[in-house]
């Protein structure tokens, strides 16, 4: 559920992203090992040069598996560790951006994400060098996209 300000962002936690080398194999093994049937087909996010798949861990919280498209060197370093980012849904990206910046989170360029129906998303680098993503979405919007993208 997206939140406006004042945050606690933790209440709007949406997904954790993990980088993988082989998206199809990772989606299949996670879904099978965890007994999770609800997952999306692969979605290309051209602006980030990645392909992603979401697996529902519990209602409203997902594991996003992320695989770099050919030539995407910036994601390659995350393949060593697996963890990539934590994402929160927000109602007002501009206001949330100001709050993140006031807490010394460095904003990276915002982008429209195909995985979120073209809605605006933005990554921030924390003072501890972790990536946090904020995506501006209306309430219930991602669930509708998720259902429409379920893998056969």
Locate predicted features.
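N-terminal beta-strand motif that seeds the catalytic metal site of vicinal oxygen chelate
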Residues: 1-27, 81-88, 140-152
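Vicinal oxygen chelate
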Residues: 2-9, 12-21, 53-58, 63, 74-152
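Conserved active-site tyrosine of GNAT-family acetyltransferases
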Residues: 26-31, 100
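Residues within well-ordered alpha-helices
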Residues: 26-27, 51, 96
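Conserved acetyl-CoA-binding loop of GNAT-fold acetyltransferases
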Residues: 32-39, 103-107
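Conserved catalytic-core motifs of GNAT/GCN5-like acyltransferases
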Residues: 37-46, 110-115
